[in-house]
């Protein structure tokens, strides 16, 4: 799936709306946009909380890329776990 990447080096990602889980799994990167512009979350990212808008892309530029459209949401990063709450 990811060449030369150990499973423990991937980010655990959960993306949820009020009604359903949109994604639950592992990814190498998470890309989105906030008021300051575009940003990436990579493995072992520092703890982080931000509001996001428009989209979340998992594994941007890789064969496993997944794009999730949203109006707005919140992203939290803690201990290599990314949680995205859509529609907040």
Task: Write out the residue ranges for each language-model feature.
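Structural preference for solvent-exposed beta-strand-turn elements
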Residues: 4-7
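Compact, glycine-rich, soluble single-domain proteins
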Residues: 12-88
């Amino acid at each position: 799936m990811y060449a030369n990447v150990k499973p423990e080096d991937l980010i655990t990602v959960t993306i949820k709306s009020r009604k359903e889980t949109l994604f639950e799994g592992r990814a190498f990167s998470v890309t989105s946009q906030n008021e300051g512009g575009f940003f990436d979350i990579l493995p072992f990212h520092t703890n982080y909380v931000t509001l996001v808008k428009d989209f979340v892309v998992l594994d941007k530029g890789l064969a496993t890329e997944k794009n999730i459209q949203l109006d707005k949401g919140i992203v939290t990063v803690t201990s290599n776990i990314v949680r995205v709450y859509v529609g907040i």
